[in-house]
A protein has these predicted regions:
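Intrinsically disordered, low-complexity terminal tails
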Residues: 255-261
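Extended acidic low-complexity intrinsically disordered regions
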Residues: 239-253
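Compositionally biased terminal segments of proteins
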Residues: 1-243, 263-267
Length: 267
């Protein structure tokens, strides 16, 4: 993580840059070399939903001729975009699955040669849960997706999420225990929009604490320990984690239920 200001991709400029990449790719590869990009993560969220304003890079599965790399770099140079602005680095992370393309949906075709696809809703949720980073937007994205589908009248059921996790990763137990507990609790609670605001705020707080930690202890944080460190930093804040709040609320409801049964008049 870095405290330096990062480039922000929005729904509007993502479309512009992808269109320019397609045009450049067609110039270099010709008309007979079709390509496909499956947008993952924040880019997929931006394109399909309105609750998130930006992402700092564009992750994608890239199926194309070698000219695609040059096209991406050319567009990046032209618009002053950061190195790796469009990349497939996520294929080296735990959230990657070889089956992602199978569960993608059509978005657009540019220059009659580059097809853009995104990840279907419940599979995007599965990816976010698999990653489960407390210092990024993973868990708030899950809640945002659930909230928007509820508003659209196309709510996502727990069974759909379980199936998506199994389809991509082979089993429910493939998720981190914190992600399992998180999704089970929020699905039972159902206040997706309210929980989204709380979770997004908590993620920003933990992210800021992690930046401070890295400045104080350089070269300590790695890809393997970052989630553990972020979790410990979250516990040290005054704000209780959203998961802790959900568990507390669930306990209160369970404690009230027996009392209500005892107080109920006999018939």
């Amino acid at each position: 993580m870095s405290s330096e200001k990062q480039f922000e991709f929005t729904k509007e400029n993502i479309d512009l840059y992808l269109k320019e990449v397609a045009k450049e790719y067609r110039k270099q590869a010709g008309k007979k070399m079709p390509a496909e990009l499956v947008l993952i993560g924040g880019a997929s969220v931006l394109i399909n939903y309105g609750f998130r304003n930006m992402t700092t890079d564009i992750d994608a599965l890239i199926q194309a001729a070698s000219a695609m790399k040059e096209a991406i770099n050319h567009v990046g140079d032209r618009y002053g975009l950061p190195n790796g602005w469009l990349n497939a680095d996520f294929t080296n992370t735990d959230s990657y699955s070889v089956k992602l393309s199978q569960f993608s949906v059509y978005y657009k075709t540019y220059a009659n040669i580059v097809t853009i696809r995104t990840v279907a809703a419940e599979y995007l949720i599965a990816m976010k849960l698999r990653s489960g980073r407390q210092y990024k937007s993973d868990l708030s994205d899950v809640l945002g997706i659930l909230a928007e589908h509820e508003k659209r009248g196309t709510p996502i059921a727990m069974e759909q999420i379980r199936k998506a996790v199994i389809d991509l990763y082979g089993g429910w137990e493939s998720l981190p225990e914190t992600s399992q507990a998180f999704i089970e609790n929020v699905m039972e609670d159902g206040r997706f929009e309210e929980l989204y605001e709380q979770t997004a705020s908590g993620e920003k707080e933990v992210g800021a604490l992690l930046v401070q930690f890295e400045e104080k202890y350089p070269n300590v944080v790695t890809g393997k320990n970052v989630n553990e460190i972020a979790g410990n930093l979250q516990k040290k804040t005054d704000r209780a984690s959203i998961l802790a709040k959900l568990r507390e609320r669930k306990t209160e409801v369970e404690q009230k239920a027996p009392k209500q049964e005892r107080d109920a008049p006999e018939r």
